[in-house]
Amino acid sequence: MEIRADEISRIIREQIKDYGKKVEVAETGSILSQADGVARIYGLAGAAAGELLEFPGGIRGLVLNLEEDNVGAAIMGPYEHIREGDPVKRTGLIAEVPVGEELLGRVVDGLGNPIDGRGPLNAKHQRKIEIKAPGIVKRKSVHEPMQTGLKAIDALVPIGRGQRELILGDRQTGKTAVAIDTILNNKGNNLYCFYVAIGQKQSTVARVVDTLKKHGAMEYTTVISASASDPAPMQYLAPYTGVTMAEYFRDSGRHALIIYDDLSKQAVAYRQLSLLLRRPPGREAYPGDVFYLHSRLLERAAKLSDKEGAGSLTALPIIETQAGDVSAYIPTNVISITDGQIFLESNLFFQGVRPAINVGISVSRVGGSAQIKAMKQVAGSLKLDLAQYRELAAFAQFGSDLDKATQETLARGERLVELLKQGQYAPLSVEKQVIQIYAGTQKDAGGHNWIRSVPTEQVVRYMAELLEFLDARHPGIAKAIAEKKALDDGIRKDLDAALTEFAGIFKIEG
């Protein structure tokens, strides 16, 4: 065998050329104990709070506790194979998630990894999960409406862009339905929607995605799911992942909406982590910083000033109450952080009043300044009328002979309750809401309400047929309201004439 010196020297030269002087330094510790997805690690003296760690099998972990002789970390993934004594590496990274237009129409997990079987996201940008909320100077007061398509909300508890409006109520009272209707109503409004499902059944999330697809809403929506079977750290992180993705649109001068469904499950996941990390428990066994958990999340919803691009992020957090108890720890915390709340009541729901909004307790602290003038004109007295009706209805149970004025008020109240009823996944444009509420609250030439002669059980049919009639015979009225956003004398005159005409052709059944 011939040894060729030039060949050998060429190979040696190539190897020298490829030789790198770079030395990789990795700080590695070992697991002292691991239970229920929380590990205690010895030997990571340089670890920072919120840093990502690498466990065996490529599983990531998040540093939550820094103690004198060890580090407490939450394992974000399956932890059954992780044993005592296993090595754990520091990554030096803070948790980041993909952001951008590429996420629209996708379903991702609590860390932004796609779970819809449609391949990688190919997102061009990444953002840190934990960033500070915009300061006072960067903000502007809420002044633009964010329509939900639900008469009871847009008329009585209006929501503005950049607002945080809490939706709370017992289980199965229609909280998610209100949120989904809001997404459906904003089709074509250049509003990017993010739905964060925390601790939900996977079948429930699949149903929500299916509904959004059916109505063509998935093209401007991203679903972030940390389901009931996911580890507690994923359920704790999912809302922050969602808000980080939504902030990308807010900071680029666009408008976004985020729905957290629901934050009580995030608080439960955080309580679980805190107790396993042996942090001292407080009221209802929640840790002392559970308020900060939600406040730092909800403060990231904001209406930015013109100098910052005038973008907005509206938040609709959902909280589940137990037996209507609004004074429990988590509900009171979130009520104090948000700009108002919509309270859904199981009693109303079972009576067939849907959406089951308790108008008395529900408020919107800043939405009034975002409501369009036309809605203010027609719905000004609606809340008071409904409150009077509820009060009288409670007294009327005890009295048999009621005077005529009381009977009139009760009959009118019953019709107003019917007027505010609405089917699921059937949001109405604001001009159509204004027309229906005008018919319910304004008076005809004789000084009576337009729907005074309509039997209570036929009000819903009257309202549906009224819109069909106006679409067919007087389409200009709705267009004029949409353009002017106010009811001037000309529109009122046309609307009164149309209502008079409709009264002549509407047939009362039975």
Curated annotation (Swiss-Prot):
Record keyword Nucleotide-binding present: yes
GO CC terms in record: plasma membrane; proton-transporting ATP synthase complex
Residues engaged in binding ATP: 169-176
Keyword presence, Membrane: yes
Pfam families in the cross-refs: ATP-synt_ab, ATP-synt_ab_C, ATP-synt_ab_N
Secretion signal span: none
Enzyme class at the top of the EC tree: translocase
Assigned EC number: 7.1.2.2
Subcellular location: Cell inner membrane
Main location: membrane
Keywords on record: ATP synthesis, ATP-binding, Cell inner membrane, Cell membrane, CF(1), Hydrogen ion transport, Ion transport, Membrane, Nucleotide-binding, Translocase, Transport
Residues annotated as site: Required for activity: 362
Subunit structure, as described in the record: F-type ATPases have 2 components, CF(1) - the catalytic core - and CF(0) - the membrane proton channel. CF(1) has five subunits: alpha(3), beta(3), gamma(1), delta(1), epsilon(1). CF(0) has three main subunits: a(1), b(2) and c(9-12). The alpha and beta chains form an alternating ring which encloses part of the gamma chain. CF(1) is attached to CF(0) by a central stalk formed by the gamma and epsilon chains, while a peripheral stalk is formed by the delta and b chains.
HAMAP family per the UniProt record, alphabetical: ATP_synth_alpha_bact
Known function: Produces ATP from ADP in the presence of a proton gradient across the membrane. The alpha chain is a regulatory subunit.
Family: Belongs to the ATPase alpha/beta chains family.
Name by which UniProt lists this protein: ATP synthase subunit alpha
Protein's organism: Anaeromyxobacter dehalogenans (strain 2CP-C)
Gene: atpA
